[in-house]
Amino acid sequence: MTLDPNVAARLKRNADGLFTAVVQERGSGDVLMVAWMDDDALDRTLKTREATYYSRSRGEQWVKGATSGHTQYVHSVRLDCDGDTVLLTVDQVGGACHTGDHTCFDATVLL
C-alpha cells in the first residue's frame, strides 16, 4: 500500500517518521486513546477502515483489536491544521485501552 501523495505532502512527521493519532468514539464523543501512526498505518486505515497504528516499542504496525478483539471501525479521518495530528472517529468494540477500560483516560482525574 502507498499513501496518496497529496495526503503524504500535508503530513508533518517527527524525526522517526511518525505523527500522532487521536481516537474519538463516534456518538459519545469520548476521546478513547492517543497513538502513533506512520504513512503505511494511515494508508492501511484509509483503505480498510480498520484502525492501524505504529508501535514504537515493537517497531511495527498493529491493527487495533487483531489479538484482543477490541476493534475500531473507522468512520472518518481528519488532519489538524498543523498536519502533525490526525483525528480518527471510530466505532469501538470492547475497551479501547490495553487495560480493558473503555478509554485510556478512565484513570486518575488530575483536576
From Swiss-Prot:
Mg(2+) binds at residues 80, 82, 84. It comes from the Bacteria. Binds 1 Mg(2+) ion per subunit. It is found in: Cytoplasm. GO terms for cellular component: cytoplasm. Keywords: Amino-acid biosynthesis, Cytoplasm, Histidine biosynthesis, Hydrolase, Magnesium, Metal-binding, Zinc. It catalyses: 1-(5-phospho-beta-D-ribosyl)-5'-AMP + H2O = 1-(5-phospho-beta-D-ribosyl)-5-[(5-phospho-beta-D-ribosylamino)methylideneamino]imidazole-4-carboxamide. Transmembrane segments: none annotated. Pfam families: PRA-CH. Catalyzes the hydrolysis of the adenine ring of phosphoribosyl-AMP. This is Phosphoribosyl-AMP cyclohydrolase. It comes from Mycobacterium ulcerans (strain Agy99). The lineage of its organism: Bacteria, Bacillati, Actinomycetota, Actinomycetes, Mycobacteriales.
